[in-house]
Amino acid sequence: MAKTYSWSTDAEEVRRLFTLTFDDLHFLEPLRADAQRLYRALVLVWARVERTLVSDPSSIPEEVITHVSRQLSLKPSVLSQLRNHPSARSATFEAVRKHLDVRGWQEADAEQLSAYLIEKVSHTGNPSALFDAATDWMVRVGVLRREARDDH
């Protein structure tokens, strides 16, 4: 079963959400290895849209990988050369968090988000609207989603 997202994988939506900014391109420029540059770009755009850091780029939709690789004048196949060691992955995650000015989820965030959503529940019972409200809160606070990762 294909994963569903809150956005469409049609070309226009992918372009709108996953286009690298000038600052993003400048951030990626120092990376000499094509595979690492594409991986870091994917982690960056995915964190911006989905609010999570992705360890395995194959979990990202092909349309997104293709769009981002074109912006870097690379072929998606360069990812086959990626040697994503834990230390390199951690460095990528830290660099992306710093570039986006966000931080990882902390236990205290659960209580704050819960209080925020309780206030919203009185206005809507729509799960989709509550999900959007939670995402808006995370963007405003500058926090990424809590995630289960094997690289702690």
Q: Where do the language-model regions lie?
A:
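Long amphipathic alpha-helical coiled-coil/heptad-repeat bundle
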Residues: 1-152
